Structures are given as structure tokens and as C-alpha cells.
Amino acid sequence: MTIWIDADACPVPVREMVLRAGQRTATALVFVANSPLPVPRRALVKTVQVAQGFDVADNYISQHAVINDLVITQDIPLAAEIVEKGITALNPRGELYTEANIRQRLAMRNLSEELRSMGQISGGPNKFGDKEKQNFANALDRWLQKAKKTT
């Protein structure tokens, strides 16, 4: 059981929570990014720096994550690949990607991207605040408890 973190766009508070939870539960963590990450050296914590390029980190995670792992990502196309493989995917706001919601999220992402390119909308996601941190912490704890029961 490993937690894979799509670390380039992962908020620092989420990375910190994952590090604490991984240490507390002796869970392997792999932070994947295309730039160096300030991640402390600890047992069961690995950083993988992939080459620069579009979706290189995503492809690495998709190729290496397996059933019973958790992937933390904001990247909806990566989440769709992960869910299709039967692997659990969670975003930094604490929302699980599932077979029931991933198609809708992908469609909304594509629509937003299209509207942004046409100048119809601007901006990005809402502020990442205390509520989002708490939602993520709760979702991560639920997954860890469930995962520990099945191993």
C-alpha cells in the first residue's frame, strides 16, 4: 500500500498532512514532481523527480500505482485513468474521484478549459482554506483506516 502524490500542484499543507499521516501509520509515500521538492528524508518517503514535460509526472504515477494504493491529485485526466484501473484517487480538497463522478468532473473540466480559452471565464479554483484542509485530513484518515483493515 502506497500513497502517490502528484506533487507539482499539490498544496503545501496537503503535503505536510500526508507526511505526518504516513509517518504515524507507517505508510509508504511517493512524491512525484518535475521539479525538486523540499521533502524531508524519512523512512518510507520517496521523491521521484521526472523530466520536464506535459503529463510526465502523471504518466509516471499512472504506470506505477496499483490496486490498494491511493493517488492524491488535482489532475482530473490522471484521476480518470487511476479510477479506471480500480485505484482510489483523492483530490487535495478531500473529494474522492469515483466511477460515479469522474466522467462528470472530466466533462466539467473540459468545458471550463474551453470557456477559458474563449475568454468566457477567468480564474481558477476557489481559495484553499481551513475547510478544505479539514476535508482532506478527514478523507485521508478514512482511507488510511479502511486500508489498514484490509491489509
Swiss-Prot record:
What name does this protein carry?
UPF0178 protein Ping_0754
Q: Which family does it belong to?
A: Belongs to the UPF0178 family.
**Source species:** Psychromonas ingrahamii (strain DSM 17664 / CCUG 51855 / 37)
One Pfam match: DUF188
> What taxonomic classification does the UniProt entry list for its organism?
Bacteria, Pseudomonadati, Pseudomonadota, Gammaproteobacteria, Alteromonadales
Query: InterPro entries in the record, alphabetically?
Result: UPF0178
